[in-house]
Amino acid sequence: MADSTARTVKDVNPHEFVKAYSAHLKRSGKMELPEWVDIVKTARFKELPPYDPDWYYTRAASIARKIYLRQGIGVGGFQKIYGGRQRNGSRPPHFCKSSGAISRNILQQLQKMGIIDVDPKGGRLITSQGRRDLDQVAGRVDVTIA
């Protein structure tokens, strides 16, 4: 890909973008971490809290990317996206949603920062400032073709 072309979030590797944007969120210092961030599990089906101390920024970057790509997702949608398989011992496993409080808190933080806004039809949409911010970070991500 030529250096003169502008890169958007859609052009870069999702994993690399989420890492870069979570580092950007941490550096900016605009995001307030809740006091429960180091003790909470991310879902009912999890046994332990996340090992990564910066998991909150990573989840926020992932949520911002998902709203960029698909407008109108709300808390319930993110509960389904981050949900997973609950193991029930000898009984069969079933799908279980993730925590809604974590998604709600991150959406409120991103809204306070001006990256997303409430959609009148339901869910959240990305603002023009948020789109510009995410595209700037995507422009700094290295594009390596394997």
From Swiss-Prot:
Q: Name one GO biological process term.
A: ribosomal small subunit assembly
Lineage top rank: taxon: Eukaryota
Which PROSITE patterns does the UniProt entry name for this protein? Answer: RIBOSOMAL_S19E (PS00628)
Give coiled-coil spans as residue ranges: none
What Pfam family is a match for this entry? Ribosomal_S19e
What GO cellular component term, any one, is given?
cytosolic small ribosomal subunit
Q: Which InterPro entries match?
A: Ribosomal_eS19, Ribosomal_eS19_CS, WH-like_DNA-bd_sf, WH_DNA-bd_sf
Q: Which GO terms describe its molecular function?
A: RNA binding; structural constituent of ribosome
The alphabetized UniProt keywords are:
Ribonucleoprotein, Ribosomal protein
- Family recorded in the similarity comment: Belongs to the eukaryotic ribosomal protein eS19 family.
Please identify the protein, giving its name as recorded. Small ribosomal subunit protein eS19
Q: Which organism is it from?
A: Oryza sativa subsp. japonica
The gene for this chain is: RPS19A
